[in-house]
Design a protein with these regions (language model features):
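A charged N-terminal "starter" segment
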Residues: 1-136, 172, 177-179, 183, ...
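Conserved, mostly hydrophobic/aromatic
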Residues: 31, 55, 77, 109, ...
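Flexible loop/turn segments at secondary-structure boundaries
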Residues: 58-61, 83, 102, 147-148, ...
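Short acidic, glycine/serine/threonine-rich loops at helix termini
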Residues: 63, 85-86, 106-108, 127-130, ...
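Structured core elements
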Residues: 72, 95, 115-117, 139-141, ...
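Glycine-rich, aromatic-flanked loop segments that form ligand/cofactor-binding clefts
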Residues: 132-147
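Active-site loop/helix belt of alpha/beta enzymes
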Residues: 144-291
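Charged (often Lys/Glu-rich) extended helix/loop segments that serve as interaction or gating elements
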Residues: 260, 265-429
Length: 429
């Protein structure tokens, strides 16, 4: 299967006349269509709600789009909670799924109406100390340990993950929480990452639904919701088939009716915390070829680097690359496509067969809409790029400006050296 950019070269040329590369570009049309499809796929469940994983793409303008389709926010830090509040999230719109959590963050999450999802049984004491009480609605994260298997092999290894409670711990936690005043409970689990199969959610649902039945029977706790979290992936490689959210939703419905409904639990709401699935394919990193180097290998240097997209350097992750305007030319040149960091792993592609690339060519690096800009950093003094939203009508706007040296040096603003650091700022613009 061929990966097609959601933007044309003509439109990119128009955008780059106003905004210099590199930048992250987002597709409003794709985001909306996908959010609508998710909502329709789970419309059978009256209480269904998607809590978008803010960590994946922390931009309020993009979150605003998802809110139009009923999405809330899944937060894991104080600043993500602040963003959720700023975009208008109300009580019940925020899921606080954190770990190793400072008490002040539990307090803030509760103050703004967030549902606290406990990662560990010891956090019961932390929450009670922070709030002076146990919230009436609370959730616990489950980790069954071992490996999580599916029809096409091992999906992931929860036993090695730092997250969640054991089976024994979650039963004890429910009993303790109930005795301390909790009235409605949720359970949460994240057992595999970036799964490209329609079977993952239904299989996870079976595990969670069966656990919910046992928890309600043995502890007397009322299960209000089951949070399937994230894990639905995207096809980074052209030969991968995308997940079908409608098939996934129907698969979860079938298990729901087989396990929960016969136990009188047909009122349990299904929650999700999708990030990559919601945004990944609808963002790309646009960069320009600025150098070519011919040594022991053929290198193309671009004006983006791992600061703009860390995944290839950090995980060896594959991101497809389109050389704009040369989509139909033969891929008969083998390149390493590199950034300028003083690290040899700053490579967007290694030994990648691509059309001949000339200096000045625009390259689109696909599927950066989640865990792209969000994982940026400032090593080597590099500055993070702008974010641009391409609207359905073809217009575009900046939704985050690029960093400047003033941003980079901002934490020195209380010292005399601050003005010296910026004395050449105007000359470098």
């Amino acid at each position: 299967m061929k990966k097609e950019p959601f933007v044309t070269l003509k439109k990119l040329n128009e955008i780059t006349e106003k905004f210099p590369t590199p930048f992250h570009l987002y597709d409003e049309k794709g985001i909306r269509e996908n959010a609508k499809a998710l909502k329709e796929a789970f419309a059978w469940n009256k209480g269904f709600k998607e809590f978008f994983a803010v960590k994946a793409t922390p931009n309020p303008y993009l979150i605003n789009i998802l809110q139009e389709y009923g999405c809330g926010c899944d937060c894991s830090s104080e600043t993500e909670l602040m963003m959720a509040k700023a975009v208008g999230c109300k009580k019940g719109d925020i899921m606080f799924s954190s770990n190793d959590t400072p008490e002040k963050e539990f307090r803030y999450a509760d103050e703004i109406g967030g549902i606290i999802n406990l990662d560990d049984i010891t956090h019961i004491e932390s929450v009670e100390k922070a709030l002076g009480k146990i919230p009436e609605v609370i959730s616990c994260r489950y980790n069954p340990g071992g490996v999580f298997k599916i029809s096409n092999g091992i999906m992931d290894n929860p036993g090695d993950a730092k997250y969640g409670m054991t089976t024994e711990q979650i039963f004890d936690a429910f009993r303790i929480l109930k005795s301390k005043g909790a009235k409605e409970f949720g359970i949460h689990a994240f057992l595999a990452s970036n799964t490209v199969t329609n079977d993952y959610y239904p299989m996870l649902a079976k595990v969670m639904f069966e656990l919910a039945v046992k928890l309600q029977k043995e502890t007397g706790a009322h299960i209000k919701f089951i949070n399937l979290s994230g894990g639905i992936g995207i096809p980074y490689k052209p030969d991968q088939e995308p997940n079908d959210i409608r098939v996934i939703g129907e698969g979860v419905r079938k298990v729901y009716e087989e396990v929960l409904v016969p136990e009188g639990m047909g009122d349990v709401a299904i929650y999700t915390e999708l990030g990559r699935f919601m945004m990944g394919p609808y963002g790309c990193l646009v960069t320009k070829a600025i150098h070519e180097k011919h040594t022991h290998k053929e290198y193309i240097g671009v004006d983006a680097c791992a600061v703009n997209l860390m995944r290839p350097a950090m995980y060896g992750a594959y991101h497809h690359i389109t050389v704009m305007g040369k989509e139909n030319e033969p891929c008969d040149h083998k390149y390493d496509v590199t950034g300028s960091l003083c690290e040899n792993n700053d490579k967007f592609a290694i030994d990648r067969m691509l059309p001949k690339i000339d200096k000045g060519d625009l390259l689109v690096i696909h599927d950066t809409g989640a865990h792209g800009f969000a994982m940026g950093y400032n090593y080597n003094g590099k500055l993070k790029s702008a974010e641009i939203l391409l609207h359905e009508d073809g217009s575009f706007e900046m939704i985050r400006r690029a960093e400047t040296p003033r941003d980079y040096f901002a934490t020195f603003d209380c010292f005399p050296v601050f003005e010296k650091l910026l004395q050449d700022e105007d000359e470098l613009k």
